[in-house]
Swiss-Prot record:
Name used for this protein in its record: Anhydro-N-acetylmuramic acid kinase
Pfam families: AnmK (PF03702)
Source species of the chain: Aliivibrio fischeri (strain ATCC 700601 / ES114)
CDD domains: ASKHA_NBD_ANMK
Catalytic reaction equation(s): 1,6-anhydro-N-acetyl-beta-muramate + ATP + H2O = N-acetyl-D-muramate 6-phosphate + ADP + H(+)
SUPFAM superfamilies documented for this protein: Actin-like ATPase domain
Name of the gene encoding the protein in the UniProt record: anmK
Top-level EC class: transferase
Pathway: Amino-sugar metabolism; 1,6-anhydro-N-acetylmuramate degradation; Cell wall biogenesis; peptidoglycan recycling
One record GO biological process: amino sugar metabolic process
Known role: Catalyzes the specific phosphorylation of 1,6-anhydro-N-acetylmuramic acid (anhMurNAc) with the simultaneous cleavage of the 1,6-anhydro ring, generating MurNAc-6-P. Is required for the utilization of anhMurNAc either imported from the medium or derived from its own cell wall murein, and thus plays a role in cell wall recycling.
Database matches in PANTHER family: ANHYDRO-N-ACETYLMURAMIC ACID KINASE
Binding-site positions, ATP: G10, T11, S12, L13, D14, G15, V16, D17
């Protein structure tokens, strides 16, 4: 068993999730984790790039540099907290910060910032990054990548297991006995809810969904939001902030007398029902499980609404299966680093649409 570090900064832009795991590729144990905050100014600068308000190459290059230092500092903080030497770590798997993902364009591309040369040089640890573009070079979406890891953890169930990750975007992995893994992004997760509460209350997220719970669902608005053509597209598919953001959302609420808390309730229901519309297709009998991870697993009202819409499902978090729901994605990128170091496949072509299996990622040596 070797030790790997996983670094994840998702579409919620709420900081760096850092983990150390021990793995041989088939078994993975979480040894420890740390959350490392992102400077508010860096978050604001990133949001400007992600929403297209800032396209200056000099600014983007500087953010790439700043993020490299942030990820390196998160790594050193984690090692110090757990009293583990950098020499004990085989490699770091760094997802980077996605600022644009365009898999369906004439010239498909994805862009993650966070200079891995800086991470490797500053920590003294070989770093694996740029996980998505090899899959895209093979005709895939480059996302989601986590279903391959979910299959390692939860694969071959007797009944159907649906692993639901709710970060800024929601994605699902469908695990069924004797069937290929299915996985794709269902649509928004916390992203729109977080943006809305930040704009109206100055808070970074809606704790427990309390503000959404205080509102009433606006059916007219909900139905309009669900007309987005993304939801009718067949999988494999993936999405991000470039499709679902407040600028896109503004067209539906302009000059409407909606109360902010009612809009929040509707955004939560938008997330829930676009998830449910997808997962219900994979129900088998009355023994289907929905295992939730990511930040959305802490939103009590959201979890209640999922159970409401899926009365015959067992809805729980992955914590109930001894897998930390907060660190699933960071653990996945530690595992992806292991796969790359050993030249093992780490994508699921049935999930991403790639033409074949491949070992994803580029190695940035420390020396």
């Amino acid at each position: 068993m070797e030790k790997y570090i996983g670094l994840m900064s998702g579409t919620s832009l709420d900081g760096v999730d850092a983990v150390i795991v021990e793995t041989n590729g088939t078994t993975i144990n979480l040894l420890g984790h740390a959350d490392y905050p992102m400077d508010p100014q860096l978050k604001a600068d990133l949001l400007a790039v992600c929403t297209g308000q800032q396209t200056n190459l000099k600014v983007i290059g500087e953010i790439d540099h700043r993020l490299g230092h942030l990820f390196a500092e998160a790594t050193l903080h984690l090692l110090s907290t757990l009293n583990i030497a950098s020499s004990d770590i085989t490699a770091i798997g760094s997802h980077g910060q996605t600022v644009f993902h365009s898999p369906d364009a004439e010239y498909p591309f994805t862009m993650q910032l966070g200079d891995s040369n800086i991470i490797a040089a500053k920590t003294g640890i070989d770093t694996v990054a740029d996980f998505r573009r090899k899959d895209m070079a093979l005709g895939g979406q480059g996302a989601p990548l986590v279903p391959a890891f979910h299959n390692t953890l939860f694969g071959k169930p007797e009944s159907t297991n649906v692993i639901l990750n709710i970060g800024g975007i929601s994605n699902i992995s469908i695990l069924q006995k004797d069937s290929p893994v299915i996985g794709y992004d269902t649509g928004p997760g916390n992203m729109l809810m977080d943006s809305w509460i930040t704009e109206h209350k100055g808070e970074s997220y809606d704790k427990d969904g309390a503000w959404a719970r205080s509102g009433q669902i606006i059916d007219e608005l909900l139905n309009q939001l669900k007309t987005h053509d993304y939801f009718a597209r067949p999988y494999p598919k993936s999405t991000g902030r470039e499709l679902f953001n407040l600028d896109w959302f503004a067209q539906y609420i302009e000059n409407k007398p909606y109360q902010p808390q009612d809009v929040q309730a509707t955004l939560l229901e938008f997330t829930v029902t676009t998830i449910v519309d997808q997962v219900i297709r994979f129900q088998v009998g009355n023994d289907t499980k929905l295992l939730v991870c990511g930040g959305g697993a802490h939103n009590q009202f959201l979890m209640e609404r999922l159970q409401y819409h899926l009365p015959n499902w067992a809805v729980s978090t992955t914590n109930d299966y001894n897998v930390d729901s907060d660190n699933m994605e960071a653990m996945a990128f530690a595992w992806l680093a292991h796969q790359r170091i050993h030249g093992l496949p780490s994508n699921e072509p049935d999930v991403t649409g790639a033409s074949r299996y491949a070992s994803l990622g580029v190695i940035y040596p420390a020396n």
